[in-house]
Amino acid sequence: MRLFLSLPVLVVVLSMVLEGPAPAQGAPEVSNPFDGLEELGKTLEDNTQELINRITQSELPAKMWDWFSETFRKVKEKLKIDS
């Protein structure tokens, strides 16, 4: 009786194994997840480069340097007068 029940089960299991993986269970493509990551990196690089260009072309760094220089000069003069 056991052999009579185990043979059909063995045939079904063997047919499932030999059939191969279902399309949804196939091996995922390795390059697919990395394509999105590469695109994200490229976008981040472009945005960073654009930001650096805007900062270097703006007057903000020059104004900040002038303000720091002027403040430092005033502090030096104040310390000379007090000493």
Swiss-Prot record:
Protein name, per record = Apolipoprotein C-I, acidic form
Q: Which UniProt keywords apply?
A: Lipid transport, Secreted, Signal, Transport
Which InterPro entries does the record cross-reference, listed alphabetically? ApoC-1_sf, ApoC-I
Q: Which organism is it from?
A: Gorilla gorilla gorilla (Western lowland gorilla)
Q: Origin, by domain of life?
A: Eukaryota
Q: What else is known?
A: Apolipoprotein C-I is present in acidic (APOC1A) and basic (APOC1B) forms in P.paniscus, P.abelii and P.troglodytes and perhaps also in baboons and macaques. The two genes for ApoC-I arose through a duplication process that occurred after the divergence of New World monkeys from the human lineage. In human, the acidic form has become a pseudogene sometime between the divergence of bonobos and chimpanzees from the human lineage and the appearance of the Denisovans. Pseudogenization resulted when the codon for the penultimate amino acid in the signal sequence was changed to a stop codon.
The Gene Ontology CC terms held by the record are: high-density lipoprotein particle; very-low-density lipoprotein particle
Q: Which family does it belong to?
A: Belongs to the apolipoprotein C1 family.
Q: Please list which residues make up the signal peptide.
A: 1-26
Q: Does the keyword Transport apply?
A: yes
**Gene assigned in the entry:** APOC1A
- Under the GO molecular function aspect, what terms does this record hold? fatty acid binding; phospholipase inhibitor activity
Q: Where in the cell is it found?
A: Secreted
Q: Name one Pfam family in it.
A: ApoC-I
Q: Which GO terms describe its biological process?
A: lipid transport; lipoprotein metabolic process; negative regulation of cholesterol transport; negative regulation of lipid catabolic process; negative regulation of very-low-density lipoprotein particle clearance; triglyceride metabolic process; very-low-density lipoprotein particle clearance
